[in-house]
Structures are given as structure tokens and as C-alpha cells.
Design a protein with these regions (language model features):
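Glycine- (often His-adjacent) and acidic-residue-rich active-site loop
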Residues: 1, 8, 16-55, 71, ...
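Short glycine/serine/threonine-enriched helix-capping/active-site loop
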Residues: 14-16, 170
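Conserved hydrophobic packing residues within short motifs/helices of P-loop NTPase cores
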Residues: 12-14, 64
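Crotonase-fold acyl-CoA enzyme core
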Residues: 7, 54-168
């Protein structure tokens, strides 16, 4: 929210810390206590993830996602909410929802078919297969997959290029 109102912000970067980008939503805090009411996962998504996806999509400046490792579930879909996604060649994307009986959330059912086509989106969503960053780039799901050793430099160059552009018109 602070970045939205800051005129000095020219581009927004979303990335992970450590070896992975984002393993997705932590469902452990959604466990039902003995005798307790079922947790409404839909309400949780509406409260926690939908506002983040909408904020990314409505930023007045370009949004870049730098995927530095595994992007699973909601993590993969948060990446897809950004304008440009660049990933290390060792990164991967996994629509892991089917493994736990959930429908892809955080914009997954919206973005996947638009980026990779209906058949591929259905396959990714129903099978939960790991998609390499290189395959994701070949399918048009992300902008590019970069050698791990050159990743930081490539991201910095991309950010500088976007920040130097007329960002309101991009």
C-alpha cells in the first residue's frame, strides 16, 4: 500500500528470500479443532490472498516477480499476478492444489489458461506436475528463465530498464 502512494517508486519487485520463492499458503493454521467448526478456506483466501493479487494487478507502476526457486500453489499464482515474471533456470512452478483437494486459488484459474492455454492449464491444475522455469518460459507463462549465476544481474538490469521508462504509460 505504501508503494502505491509513493511517487518515487518506479517499479515494484516481488521475490522470495532464501532457496525458494514461495511454498504457497500455510494451511496448518486452518486445522479444525476437535469439536470445532470447519475453517472457511474461501473466506481465508478472500481475506488474505485476494487483496494481495488485486493490489499487484492494480499497481500504477510495473510489477516484476523474480522467482528464485520453487513457486508452489498460491506462491505460483502470486507470481503470475505480476506484469513480468523472470525465474532462475533451477526454479519451478507447481499447481499443488489438487494434491490437497483444493481448486487453484489466488488467481490461478484466471491466469493459467490465459497464459498457457486451456489444455495446459487443465493439465497443470489437475495433475499438479512440476513445471520447470524453462518450460514455463517456452509456454509463455513467464517472461524468461535465466541462468542461476546471472539471475541477480538480470533482475537488476530489468528493474533499471523499467524504472527508466515512462512507467505510467507501460
Amino acid at each position: 500500500a505504501a508503494a502505491r502512494g509513493d511517487a518515487s517508486v518506479r517499479v515494484l519487485l516481488l521475490t522470495g528470500a532464501g532457496r525458494g520463492f514461495c511454498a504457497g499458503q500455510d494451511l496448518s493454521d486452518r486445522a479444525v479443532a476437535p469439536g470445532g467448526a470447519a475453517v472457511d478456506l474461501g473466506a481465508s483466501i478472500d481475506r488474505n490472498y485476494k487483496p494481495l493479487v488485486l493490489a499487484l494487478r492494480s499497481m500504477p507502476v510495473p510489477t516484476v516477480c523474480a522467482v528464485n526457486g520453487v513457486a508452489a500453489g498460491a506462491g505460483a499464482n502470486l507470481a503470475l499476478a505480476c506484469d513480468i515474471v523472470v525465474a532462475t533456470k533451477s526454479a519451478s512452478f507447481i499447481q499443488a492444489f489438487c494434491r490437497i483437494g483444493l481448486v487453484p486459488d489466488s488467481g490461478g484459474t484466471y491466469w493459467l489458461p490465459r497464459l498457457v492455454g486451456t489444455a495446459r492449464a487443465i493439465g497443470l491444475a489437475m495433475l499438479g506436475d512440476k513445471l520447470s522455469a524453462e518450460q514455463a518460459a517456452a509456454w509463455g507463462m513467464i517472461w524468461q528463465a535465466v541462468d542461476d549465476a546471472a539471475f541477480a544481474e538480470a533482475v537488476e538490469k530489468l528493474l533499471a530498464q523499467l524504472a527508466a521508462a515512462p512507467t505510467k504509460g507501460l
